[in-house]
């Protein structure tokens, strides 16, 4: 990274050293007045943006290639992230960089979640939007979307997840010192919401690698039928269930929830609903209503965007949707509640919001990822992949830390439900 002795430049001086693309980007950056960002230029020198009163070093970007400015002009925030992936800029603290732009989201044009538009930036975002729409989650496309992320390699995910292989936010409290303990607490919280007991048959929509099913059966003695459309996840989940001696209590089915038939006491889904997109969330809520018994309970953990910004998120596309989770969309709590009522007669009974816990979870994953880069390379992943995943983890960490997005556990019930008794205790 640049030396602290690099001379400070005025906006005019910094613009003079580059072409039109640089000038356009610097002009937009000059409008951002929250936090602090120092931009170091390829020819030397730096320019500061944000508030002079902001404490600490703030965020820092070292531009290595003038093409970084061109990407930003053409693709706005997606161009910024793609420039990092291609090595055109670097930073010692990616979360701080993303955090700077989130602090200024109302003044940052043409980004997901922002209502501000600027004709000078984002000329190619329409192409990104069309590409995103083409990844809508019908049955065939849903399998392809899931495979692109979750079927990368089970060994890859082992490198940075804890032993439970939970790839969702943990819940941290005064009793959770490690990521594994915090993931156990997340699972416990869902079990408590569901009042799970030995007589329950639980439907899980989205198996992951079997971590929640293993926890639920080993602590509550229930039965679990778990649905997944990822062959790689299914294979490892079945292997882990067999090793735990619980194959008689847990069935993992390679099946789309829309095709499943059955009748269940309880339903759980952990960070799967975001993958559905706007169009297919109603089908999920209808399926839950169809598959749950009249006195059934449903507990979901899902990632949220602010209700007031949902339409902006829905009509946009960001780095995560283009490069990490194609076809996905963060959820509005209000919309989920309305659809659960409309499609299944449910009402929201309890809601826990723990967004900062996800920032801490992502930081733990990012640290483990960096500590195991040799293992990532040994699996055949190149430096571009490493930079993309490094950015993904820190990008999401910043979004949760700045409360731009959140994560909730929500319990849904139908009215007059006697199943809402005190939470069950873990099995002895």
Annotated model-derived regions:
Residues 223-228:
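Conserved SAM-binding motif I beta-strand of class I
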Residues 258-267:
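A short acidic, Gly/Pro-enriched loop at the edge of an enzyme's catalytic core
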Residues 295-303:
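Conserved beta-strand signature within the Rossmann-like core of class I S-adenosyl-L-methionine
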Residues 1-183, 189:
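Feature captures hydrophobic
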Residues 303-420, 426-428:
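Substrate-binding/catalytic lobe of Class I Rossmann-like enzymes that use SAM or dcSAM, i.e.
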């Amino acid at each position: 990274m640049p030396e602290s002795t690099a001379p400070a430049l005025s906006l005019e001086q910094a613009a003079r050293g580059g072409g039109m693309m640089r000038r356009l980007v610097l002009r937009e950056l000059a409008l951002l007045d929250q936090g602090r960002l120092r931009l170091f230029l390829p020819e030397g020198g730096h320019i500061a943006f944000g508030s002079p009163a902001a404490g600490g070093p703030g965020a820092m970007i070292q531009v290595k290639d003038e093409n970084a400015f061109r990407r930003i002009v053409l693709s706005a925030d997606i161009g910024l992230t793609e420039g990092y992936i291609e090595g055109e800029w670097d930073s010692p603290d990616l979360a701080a960089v993303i955090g700077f732009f989130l602090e200024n989201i109302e003044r940052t044009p043409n980004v997901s979640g922002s209502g501000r538009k600027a004709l000078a930036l984002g000329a190619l975002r329409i192409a990104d939007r069309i590409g995103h729409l083409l990844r809508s989650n019908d049955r065939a496309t849903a399998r392809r979307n899931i495979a692109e992320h979750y079927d990368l390699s089970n060994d890859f995910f082992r490198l940075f997840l804890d032993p439970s292989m939970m790839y969702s936010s943990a819940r941290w409290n005064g009793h959770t010192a490690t990521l594994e303990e915090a993931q156990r607490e997340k699972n416990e919280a869902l079990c408590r919401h569901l009042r799970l007991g030995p007589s329950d048959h639980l439907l899980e929509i989205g198996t992951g690698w079997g971590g929640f099913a293993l926890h639920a059966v080993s602590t509550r003695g229930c039965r679990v039928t778990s649905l997944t459309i990822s062959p790689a996840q299914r294979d490892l989940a079945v292997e882990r269930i067999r090793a735990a001696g619980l194959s008689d209590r847990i069935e993992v089915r390679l099946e789309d929830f829309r095709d499943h038939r059955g009748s269940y006491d309880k339903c759980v889904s952990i960070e799967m609903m975001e993958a559905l997109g706007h169009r297919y969330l109603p089908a999920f809520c209808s399926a839950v209503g169809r598959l749950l018994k009249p006195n059934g309970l449903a507990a979901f953990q899902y990632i949220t965007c602010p209700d007031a910004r949902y339409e902006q998120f829905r009509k946009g596309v960001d780095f995560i949707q283009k490069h990490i989770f194609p076809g996905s969309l963060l959820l509005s709590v209000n919309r989920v509640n309305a659809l659960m009522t409309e499609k299944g007669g449910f009402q929201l009974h309890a809601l826990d919001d723990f967004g900062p816990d996800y920032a801490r979870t992502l930081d733990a994953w990012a640290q483990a990822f960096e500590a195991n880069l040799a293992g990532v390379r040994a699996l055949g992943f190149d430096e571009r992949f490493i930079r993309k995943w490094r950015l993904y983890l820190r990008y999401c960490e910043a979004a949760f830390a700045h409360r731009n997005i959140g994560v909730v556990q929500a319990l849904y019930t139908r009215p007059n439900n006697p199943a809402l008794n005190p939470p069950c205790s873990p099995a002895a």
